[in-house]
């Protein structure tokens, strides 16, 4: 499927919950998009990612470039052209949305104008852009935290803002939002065996998260070839879920669509045309 010469879309895998697409851009860079549960499209915002999370395939090759607004919109239009009406869109694929602020903010506005609810997932930095995005016309903002201790955060989200600075910004900015808008903000915690799954780490995370009054997405890890990290066992995952609930948090478990090897969280990949040494983020 060709979308106005901006990109081509090829379906490469299908399962009970997800349909996975390779998106080839005009310069032959490639990213991926996923249709979850038949009505939610996860789009990519960059070719690669500079945040360098060790558990995620999207940034394994570094960052090539950010996508343009036409390239973001074309992902939506190309899927709809296949006869697949979309109930919602999320900018949660390859890339860090806050590293492509102009295009992604314009994309959120475009989605709103056409009546398609749009959300995004971010590692939270740069922090001034997080402040800007929280008040943007989104239908959901998920901030990936993955840690209760600063050292763990630095290890798992090495190019994102530090834990204390991140929660400091959230603690300052969330009270400025309306109650309705605050309910659209959530935190994400990916549970990794031997990395961030101890009771002490979870308690520390809960102590930071509780005052914010937002929900927590407790994610299961999807194995990827570029990472040696492993997800916690199902028993440990359920234990963490119960602990966070006992700590007073509203916790949501991973949906089946998000834990499939076919397009689940952290599995999307990119292939860019720029050398890794020329990695950059847009202004």
Predicted regions and their residues:
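Classical nucleotidyltransferase
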Residues: 221, 244, 251-264
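Flexible, acidic/Gly-rich N-terminal and inter-domain linker regions that tether
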Residues: 1-39, 43, 280-283
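Short, solvent-exposed polar/charged micro-motifs at secondary-structure junctions
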Residues: 8-13, 18-22, 129-131, 196-197, ...
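Residue-level signature of catalytic and energy-coupling elements of molecular machines
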Residues: 49, 216, 265
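Conserved AdoMet/S-adenosylmethionine-binding subsite of the radical SAM
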Residues: 79-243, 247
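Canonical Radical SAM [4Fe-4S] cluster-binding loop centered on the CxxxCxxC motif
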Residues: 36-71
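SAM-dependent transferase fold signal centered on methyltransferase-like domains
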Residues: 2-7, 20, 51-52, 74, ...
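Radical SAM enzyme core and accessory elements
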Residues: 4, 258-283
């Amino acid at each position: 499927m060709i979308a106005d010469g901006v990109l081509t879309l090829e379906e490469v895998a299908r399962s009970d919950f997800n349909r996975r697409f390779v998106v080839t851009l005009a310069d032959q860079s490639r990213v991926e998009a996923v249709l979850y549960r038949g009505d939610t499209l996860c789009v990519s915002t960059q070719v690669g990612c500079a945040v360098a999370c060790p558990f995620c395939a999207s940034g394994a090759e570094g960052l090539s470039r950010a996508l343009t607004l036409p390239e973001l919109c074309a992902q939506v239009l190309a899927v709809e052209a296949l006869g697949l009406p979309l109930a919602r869109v999320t900018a949660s694929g390859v890339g860090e949305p806050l590293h492509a602020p102009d295009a992604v903010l314009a994309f959120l506005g475009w989605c709103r104008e056409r009546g398609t609810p749009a959300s995004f997932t971010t590692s939270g930095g740069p922090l001034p852009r997080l402040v800007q995005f929280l008040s943007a016309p989104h239908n959901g903002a998920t901030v990936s935290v993955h840690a209760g201790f600063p050292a763990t955060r630095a290890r798992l989200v090495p190019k994102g803002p530090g834990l204390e600075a991140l929660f400091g910004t959230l603690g300052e900015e969330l009270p400025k939002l309306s109650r309705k808008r605050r309910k659209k903000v959530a935190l994400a915690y990916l549970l990794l065996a031997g990395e961030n799954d101890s009771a002490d780490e979870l308690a520390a995370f809960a102590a930071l998260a509780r005052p914010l009054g937002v929900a927590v997405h407790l994610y299961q890890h999807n194995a990827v070839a570029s990472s040696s990290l492993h997800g916690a066992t199902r028993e440990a995952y359920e234990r963490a879920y119960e602990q966070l609930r006992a700590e007073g948090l509203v916790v949501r478990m991973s949906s089946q669509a998000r834990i499939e090897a076919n397009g689940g969280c952290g599995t999307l990949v990119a292939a860019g045309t720029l050398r890794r040494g020329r990695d950059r983020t847009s202004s």
